[in-house]
Amino acid sequence: MPKKVLTGVVVSDKMQKTVTVLVERQFPHPLYGKVIKRSKKYLAHDPEEKYKLGDVVEIIESRPISKRKRFRVLRLVESGRMDLVEKYLIRRQNYQSLSKRGGKA
């Protein structure tokens, strides 16, 4: 079985030899056909610690490196996309403020 290769944005580089990569995917709703966006965060191994916040990277599936880390960074696609990181942080902040209030706005 071929290994998964995903492309995403580095949203955190605060851990040692690890980056958090946000991967977004789009798919049509099976019944209504509306395009739906979903995102997921993956922990990826970065042994040289050369990838920084905002970098667009490719990650590839690998053997388990730790409890949650099953990908490693393959290559840098584009550097310095801080606009994507800011969108993610704003969305996360809005979600956290909604959960503190106990529901939807």
UniProtKB/Swiss-Prot annotation:
SUPFAM superfamilies: Nucleic acid-binding proteins. GO terms for molecular function: rRNA binding; structural constituent of ribosome. One of its GO terms (cellular component) is cytosolic small ribosomal subunit. Keywords: Ribonucleoprotein, Ribosomal protein, RNA-binding, rRNA-binding. One of its GO terms (biological process) is translation. InterPro entries: NA-bd_OB-fold, Ribosomal_uS17, Ribosomal_uS17_bact/chlr, Ribosomal_uS17_CS. Belongs to the universal ribosomal protein uS17 family. Part of the 30S ribosomal subunit. PANTHER family: 40S RIBOSOMAL PROTEIN S11 FAMILY MEMBER, SMALL RIBOSOMAL SUBUNIT PROTEIN US17M. One of the primary rRNA binding proteins, it binds specifically to the 5'-end of 16S ribosomal RNA. This is Small ribosomal subunit protein uS17. It comes from Thermus thermophilus.
